[in-house]
């Protein structure tokens, strides 16, 4: 069966009133993508090329939850994606800044350091790569994420988002994006 990927564009926790797009893609022929939220069918889209996009705008808590995509031909479900968690939260922390060393263009095999800088001593952060379902967690206290021996598969659009864990999780906005190219 074809594998389906599901991801958010742009990735990250969304603020109330914010917007994002759920992307479902697979190497499949014509058919339909059915989007499920918390096990309930919410929308169906015909396949356009190899992907379907479901937009969320003016987000509220009703948009939060566990999403998955099913690929259907007729009545047969041919494949299911992993589950994507969408969170809708107010942003209370300052916006972080993402930088990359040694630079935006690196040679294959090099080590790359992503640094997420935020004006908050106790924040932990996630590094996002567009197209990937999960963020990469930074070790708390360390805001550097090291990618060793980079390859073409590491290319893409990165961003970061930070949080504090107290009685409640508090979130920052998502940083501006940064594109990494591997030569």
Where are these regions (language model features)?
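Conserved Ig-like domain signature around the intradomain disulfide
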Residues: 20, 31, 62-71, 112, ...
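Short coil/turn motif common to extracellular beta-sandwich-like domains
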Residues: 11-21, 103-113
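Solvent-exposed loop segments of extracellular immunoglobulin-like
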Residues: 28-37, 118-131
């Amino acid at each position: 069966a074809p594998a389906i990927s599901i991801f958010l564009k742009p990735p990250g926790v969304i603020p109330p009133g914010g917007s994002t797009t759920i992307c479902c893609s697979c190497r499949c022929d014509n058919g339909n993508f059915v989007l499920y939220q918390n096990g309930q069918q919410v929308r169906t889209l015909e396949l356009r090329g190899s992907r379907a996009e479901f937009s969320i705008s003016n987000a509220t808590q009703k948009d939060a939850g566990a999403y998955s995509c099913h690929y259907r031909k007729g009545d047969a479900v041919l494949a299911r994606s992993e589950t994507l968690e969408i969170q809708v939260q107010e942003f209370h922390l300052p916006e972080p800044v993402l930088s990359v060393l040694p630079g935006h263009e690196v040679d294959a095999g090099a080590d790359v350091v992503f640094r997420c800088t935020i004006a908050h001593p106790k924040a932990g952060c996630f590094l996002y790569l567009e197209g990937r379902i999960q963020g990469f967690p930074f070790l708390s206290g360390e805001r550097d994420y090291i990618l060793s021996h980079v390859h073409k598969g590491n290319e893409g659009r990165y961003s970061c988002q930070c949080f504090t864990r107290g009685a409640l999780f508090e979130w920052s906005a998502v940083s501006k994006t940064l594109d990494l190219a591997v030569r």
